[in-house]
């Protein structure tokens, strides 16, 4: 278990809203809440930056955090992240913000304290690059890229 430092920036966290938490014992992501003063109406195709009321300091270059949309909001409501995936570097100490994008066709109400995204902590491999002129082994795929294997 790795300890990650968290700073509470909104007094409602821990009283009105829970700390970021796992919804189930098998959850990978911790839910993040909208720490806003009033509900916000997010119009179709609009993006808005929502504060979460916390800052994290990972302090380990081999760990990063990613912010992901909540699957129900994305699939059912059309609410996803404006930057698709948020990345929190190990040396960042500012407030965790969530860019919400309404890709749906209806207005969406972001309510005070609503669970809007999830944060996942993952290991990072920091490679040392070896410059080569050719790869020693030819793979079956070689340089075939986007769509080369079809959809069947």
Curated annotation (Swiss-Prot):
Cofactor or coenzyme needed: Mg(2+)
Similarity remark: Belongs to the dUTPase family.
Transmembrane intervals: none
Enzyme class at the top of the EC tree: hydrolase
GO BP annotation list: dUMP biosynthetic process; dUTP catabolic process
Pathway stated in the Swiss-Prot or TrEMBL entry: Pyrimidine metabolism; dUMP biosynthesis; dUMP from dCTP (dUTP route): step 2/2
Residues engaged in binding substrate: 70-72, 83, 87-89, 97
Function: This enzyme is involved in nucleotide metabolism: it produces dUMP, the immediate precursor of thymidine nucleotides and it decreases the intracellular concentration of dUTP so that uracil cannot be incorporated into DNA.
Molecular-function annotations in GO: dUTP diphosphatase activity; magnesium ion binding
Catalytic reaction equation(s): dUTP + H2O = dUMP + diphosphate + H(+)
Keywords of this entry: Hydrolase, Magnesium, Metal-binding, Nucleotide metabolism
SUPFAM superfamilies in the record: dUTPase-like (SSF51283)
Protein's name in the database: Deoxyuridine 5'-triphosphate nucleotidohydrolase
Gene for this chain: dut
């Amino acid at each position: 278990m790795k300890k990650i430092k968290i700073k509470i920036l909104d007094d409602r966290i821990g009283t009105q809203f829970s700390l970021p938490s796992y919804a189930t014992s098998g959850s990978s992501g911790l839910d993040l809440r909208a720490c806003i003063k009033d509900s916000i109406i997010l119009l179709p195709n609009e993006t808005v930056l929502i504060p979460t009321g916390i800052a994290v300091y990972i302090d380990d270059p081999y760990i990063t955090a990613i912010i992901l949309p909540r699957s129900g909001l994305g699939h059912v409501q059309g609410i996803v992240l404006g930057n698709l995936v948020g990345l929190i570097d190990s040396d960042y100490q500012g407030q965790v913000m969530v860019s919400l994008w309404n890709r749906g066709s209806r207005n969406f109400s972001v309510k005070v304290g609503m669970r809007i995204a999830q944060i996942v902590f993952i290991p990072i491999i920091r490679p040392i690059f070896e410059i080569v002129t050719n790869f020693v082994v030819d793979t079956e795929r070689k340089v075939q890229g986007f769509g080369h294997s079809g959809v069947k």
